[in-house]
Amino acid sequence: MSEPLKPRIDFAEPLKEEPTSAFKAQQTFSEAESRTFAPAAIDERPEDEGVAEAAVDAALRPKRSLWRKMVMGGLALFGASVVGQGVQWTMNAWQTQDWVALGGCAAGALIIGAGVGSVVTEWRRLWRLRQRAHERDEARELLHSHSVGKGRAFCEKLAQQAGIDQSHPALQRWYAAIHETQNDREIVGLYAHLVQLVLDAQARREISRFAAESTLMIAVSSLALVDMAFIAWRNLRLINRIATLYGIELGYYSRLRLFRLVLLNIAFAGASELVREVGMDWMSQDLAARLSTRAAQGIGAGLLTARLGIKAMELCRPLPWIDNDKPRLGDFRRQLIGQLKETLQKSKSSPEK
């Protein structure tokens, strides 16, 4: 009974080898050589995308400022004044039997009620978009936790928000895979691999379809104004589709907020990756010599649409990326180039026939 307890063994993690320190051989410098030493230049690397992602996630949090409180207080006071004045007008119209004024008060009450209802609905949808960021933080904590009891309820809530029925095959596989001895990290990890991947696959198909449409539209069209309007319309529809797929109902202001956050994310972290992904393929295959200028512009527009969809997918997704399952531009680049080449070959072969 006096033997010490053995340390805990986690079979899900790889074995850790004890580091062995390697010593270099001694090197002696003369006094003349030491005078020629120069300080080593430090390579200042730019911030990685994790800093940009954190900045965008922080932008999703509600910000409480003094000016905002003053504006909200003024609007509340103005609304109370309008309601009080409307009640007084209604009482005066009823006492004087002024039916025209009474009808106007009723119409005004209906309009105000509709406006208040729309504002409440927009606020609820915007609050739901902000809550998704808190859910990602909670999921990140559960993925690093060894506690028991919270993971199953959290995953069931996510499935209900996404509109996944209890009889869905992916959800049934998840129920069959979990048991009482698993902790929250394992339960959430199983949900991410069995259920969340189904939604991610649907989002990838939507991104591929919208990116291909943008590529082909820019490649065959010669009107810049029409191209800009088409790309803007398709990008907004892509954001709506991805948000609906992940169980988020966007209103007017929440849609604008999500679109702004996606563009902010692209401006932070997208330029370097876009140049790297596109340049790697263009320099290797010399596409500039094989395709026309319009086709090259179409590929660029399609890649930007794909980048927009990836970032919208990341902001609407309830779970953080794990096991390098985040989609990359390279996943869509080859598909776009193949579809564009196939379309150009068909267009060249049709006049010959």
UniProtKB/Swiss-Prot annotation:
Coiled coil, from the record: none
Record bears the keyword Metal-binding: no
Listed Pfam families: DUF697
Region (Disordered), start-end ranges: 1-35
Basic and acidic residues bias (residue ranges): 1-19
Spans traversing the lipid bilayer: 70-90, 100-120, 213-233
GO cellular component: plasma membrane
Record membrane topology: Multi-pass membrane protein
Keyword set, alphabetical order: Cell inner membrane, Cell membrane, Membrane, Transmembrane, Transmembrane helix
UniProt subcellular location: Cell inner membrane
Annotated InterPro entries: DUF697, UPF0283
Disulfide cysteine pairs (residue numbers): none
UniProt family annotation: Belongs to the UPF0283 family.
Name the record gives this protein: UPF0283 membrane protein YcjF
Organism: Salmonella gallinarum (strain 287/91 / NCTC 13346)
Encoding gene, per UniProt annotation: ycjF
